[in-house]
């Protein structure tokens, strides 16, 4: 053994070839600060070996290196800029030493090689991969850019266009695509990986492969003419401006850095990468996006812990076909859980099967599946008008019309057709689970399971724990949701649960703005372009359905009369009474027509202004800041109330539910991350200006206490240790 660290070791393999093996405690390798330091120490030992002829890098895990240790990021990002820059220089000196070894080097890459893992293998001369490889640089999705030389080496290896596509989009690619673009040099079966790697190294050692020529382009300026450079970078900047926008600075910074570094060799190019990385790491966007990643890990870990002793349902059923039922059935079948889809008429069953078939055909068109796979999946969805086979199902989700009487009747009838241990769930979006459970003989086997539309796209499923829901019931439904590829978040019961409970105060703020004379077009524009929502409130209401919102508004008002009971007729009432139900019938705040792809396209409709005039004061202008404040304060206050009342268990779960269920702008990180970034005291000052607007604008006492004591909702993060100690971690 030449060197043994906590996360890697170095040893002789054969005939002058050494192997450096990443083998961290636990299930995965991460390129954390300690591993970077250990890699430097291993290279120091290696540089003294006069008999060294070649080096093989490999992993003892199912994945090579999954990336940097993102749990370290928030503390690293608090380190002063100069110290962070020094540490990056140190880390890059380690990878440069790997790249500068006087012998050929090869990385045998299996599973994931992402972020720092990818940057590590870019420093070797050759890369041999297994078919399960996923390799790429996802840093821009975390609000930063590659910092270990990825923005320098990748363009010089692949050419500007392919590298920009990966770096700017934060993409990873599979083995075959990586081979095609030159990111890896070969793909071999797992059992042949080491044998193949040694064979390539031997060829390089004997001179059959020119490893020096392979290495040289990574040390030089990017080989692009002025015209080629202008075309590549102009197109890339245009694409990034269109897709990322101003709220996500990292992709544009990465493109501009690669452009500026193109005319320099490795050392100066790395300096430019360093100068760009450090300011990005100190942005609120980076902290928010890293926070989302960590929250996602926390939520998924919590679900895994909850279901560790539970068998995943093997047979499911959906009550109520149509678009929603068909979407749920598709998602379950697609992920390997056969499903019975029951309805009371053929028309709805046909609609549900058509929806499932449409989604599968899209997968076929994209090359994700072949015809055989499509036929196999669709055959596991069984449409039926009766309860045949329900005695075999493990879990049933009801997705019928949002009417408590109908839901109670359907659930009570179904309970008589299933085994005593079968779990029942309701896809209700607003009706309290306790109310629906009153119709059942076994309420302990019942809970809520709220999907979001469209089911195949929206990652969140709210699992609602009723007063009598058993732990086993919740665990079974969480297991099914996880199997479907969803992110389940368990909440406690109340009208609207968590997501809709906090959404409708937001809509109430919108209604009040319109009542006071705001133009809905400007409100949408501000909330989309300035705050960053994917849709403004008017557009969102049209997508949700004005009729659906009108009904849900009444349910929420009955549940929370002090805050959510209206004392006036509002814009939603006016549109509902005029049968303008949104996209579903082509008329809402906008008029909708199908575009060439069959998707609804919104158009201006002057008639809506006359309708809104009947429930509004004369038009007047509002500043962007006032619009944002009046829209967001009711939502933020309600989110805080949900935490204080125990409806949602933690700020992390609340923020993930908002991002995954409502599209809360990820660069804000969620409501609690946004509050912490603003500061509770600053938020309180803003909110107090609008308290006269009513109870929805009254700040909860718990938030006032946070402001008084200057306490954040997330635990404070301490800066990482000084750079000197990071080196030797």
UniProtKB/Swiss-Prot annotation:
Note the CDD domains from the entry: crotonase-like (cd06558)
A Gene Ontology biological process annotation? fatty acid beta-oxidation
**Superkingdom of the organism of origin:** Bacteria
Q: In which pathway does it act?
A: Lipid metabolism; fatty acid beta-oxidation
Query: Which positions in this protein are listed as binding NAD(+)?
Result: 324, 343, 400-402, 407, 429, 453
Does the record's keyword annotation contain Acetylation?
no
Please name the catalytic residues of this protein: 450
* SUPFAM superfamilies tied to this protein: 6-phosphogluconate dehydrogenase C-terminal domain-like, ClpP/crotonase, NAD(P)-binding Rossmann-fold domains
Query: Is the keyword Thylakoid assigned to this protein?
Result: no
Region (Disordered) location: 708-729
Extract the GO molecular function terms from the UniProt entry: 3-hydroxybutyryl-CoA epimerase activity; delta(3)-delta(2)-enoyl-CoA isomerase activity; enoyl-CoA hydratase activity; long-chain-3-hydroxyacyl-CoA dehydrogenase activity; NAD+ binding
E.C. number(s) listed in UniProt: 4.2.1.17, 5.1.2.3, 5.3.3.8, 1.1.1.35
Transmembrane stretches in the record are none
Q: Family per UniProt?
A: In the N-terminal section; belongs to the enoyl-CoA hydratase/isomerase family. In the C-terminal section; belongs to the 3-hydroxyacyl-CoA dehydrogenase family.
Chain's role: Involved in the aerobic and anaerobic degradation of long-chain fatty acids via beta-oxidation cycle. Catalyzes the formation of 3-oxoacyl-CoA from enoyl-CoA via L-3-hydroxyacyl-CoA. It can also use D-3-hydroxyacyl-CoA and cis-3-enoyl-CoA as substrate.
Protein name per the record:
Fatty acid oxidation complex subunit alpha
Q: What is the organism of origin for this protein?
A: Salmonella paratyphi B (strain ATCC BAA-1250 / SPB7)
State the encoding gene: fadB
């Amino acid at each position: 053994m030449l060197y043994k660290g906590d996360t890697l070791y170095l040893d002789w393999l054969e005939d002058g070839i050494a192997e450096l093996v990443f083998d961290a405690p636990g299930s995965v390798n991460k390129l954390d600060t300690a591993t970077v330091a250990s890699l430097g120490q291993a290279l120091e030992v290696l540089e003294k070996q006069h008999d060294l002829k070649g080096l093989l890098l490999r992993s003892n895990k199912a994945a090579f290196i999954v990336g940097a240790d993102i749990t370290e990021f928030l503390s690293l990002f608090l380190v002063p800029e100069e110290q962070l820059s020094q540490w990056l220089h140190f880390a890059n000196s380690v990878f440069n030493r790997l790249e500068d070894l006087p012998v050929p080097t090869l990385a045998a890459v299996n599973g994931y090689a992402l972020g720092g893992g990818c940057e590590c293998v870019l420093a070797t001369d050759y890369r041999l991969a297994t078919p399960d490889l996923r390799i790429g640089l996802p840093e821009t999705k975390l609000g930063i850019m590659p910092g270990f030389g990825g923005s320098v080496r990748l363009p010089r290896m692949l050419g500007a266009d392919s590298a920009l596509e990966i770096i700017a989009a934060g993409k990873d690619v599979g083995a075959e695509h990586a081979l095609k673009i030159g990111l890896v040099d070969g793909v071999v079966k797992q059992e042949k990986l080491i044998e193949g790697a040694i064979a390539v190294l031997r060829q390089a050692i004997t001179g059959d492969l020119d490893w020096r020529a392979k290495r040289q382009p990574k040390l030089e300026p990017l080989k692009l003419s002025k015209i080629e450079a202008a075309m590549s970078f102009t197109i890339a900047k245009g694409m990034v401006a269109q897709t990322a926008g101003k709220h996500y600075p990292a992709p544009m910074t990465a493109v501009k850095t690669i452009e500026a570094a193109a005319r320099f060799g490795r050392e100066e190019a790395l300096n430019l990468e360093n100068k760009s990385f450090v300011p990005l790491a100190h942005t609120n966007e980076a902290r928010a996006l890293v926070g989302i990643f960590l929250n996602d890990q926390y939520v998924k870990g919590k679900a895994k812990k909850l279901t560790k002793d539970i068998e995943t349902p093997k047979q499911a059923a959906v009550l109520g076909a149509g678009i929603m039922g068909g979407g749920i059935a598709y998602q379950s079948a697609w992920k390997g859980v056969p499903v019975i889809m029951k309805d009371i008429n053929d028309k709805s069953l046909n609609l549900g099967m058509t929806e499932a078939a449409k989604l599968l055909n899209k997968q076929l068109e994209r090359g994700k599946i072949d015809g055989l796979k499509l036929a196999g999946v669709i055959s596991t969805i069984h449409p039926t008008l009766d309860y045949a086979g329900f005695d075999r199902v493990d879990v049933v989700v009801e997705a019928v019309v949002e009417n408590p009487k109908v839901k109670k009747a359907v659930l009570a009838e179904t309970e008589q057709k299933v085994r005593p241990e079968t779990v029942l769930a309701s896809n209700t979006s607003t009706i309290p689970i306790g109310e629906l459970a009153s119709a059942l003989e076994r309420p302990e086997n019942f809970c809520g399971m709220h999907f979001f539309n469209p089911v195949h796209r929206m990652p969140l499923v709210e699992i609602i724990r009723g007063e009598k829901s058993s732990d086993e019931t919740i665990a079974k439904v969480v297991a099914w949701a996880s199997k479907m590829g969803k992110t389940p978040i368990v909440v406690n019961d109340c009208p609207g649960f968590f997501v809709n409970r906090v959404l409708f105060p937001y809509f109430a703020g919108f209604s009040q703005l319109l009542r006071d004379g705001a133009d809905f077009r400007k409100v949408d524009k501000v909330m989309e372009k300035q705050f960053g929502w994917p849709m403004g409130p008017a557009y969102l209401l049209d997508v949700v359905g004005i009729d659906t919102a009108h009904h849900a508004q009444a349910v929420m008002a009955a549940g929370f009369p002090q805050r959510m009971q209206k004392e006036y007729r509002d814009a939603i009432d006016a549109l509902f009474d005029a049968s303008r139900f949104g996209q579903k019938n082509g008329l809402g705040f906008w008029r909708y027509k199908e575009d060439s792809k069959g998707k609804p396209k919104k158009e201006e409709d002057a008639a809506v202004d006359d309708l809104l005039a009947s429930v509004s004061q004369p038009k007047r202008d509002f500043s962007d800041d006032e619009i944002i404040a009046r829209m967001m304060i009711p939502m933020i206050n309600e989110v805080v109330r949900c935490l204080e009342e125990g409806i949602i268990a933690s700020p992390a779960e609340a923020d993930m539910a908002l991002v995954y269920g409502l599209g809360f702008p990820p660069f804000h990180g969620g409501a609690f991350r946004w509050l912490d970034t603003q500061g509770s005291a600053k938020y309180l000052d803003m909110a107090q200006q609008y308290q006269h607007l009513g109870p929805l604008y009254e700040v909860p006492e718990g938030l006032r206490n946070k402001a008084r004591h200057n306490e954040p909702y997330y635990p404070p993060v301490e800066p990482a240790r000084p750079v000197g100690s990071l080196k030797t971690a």
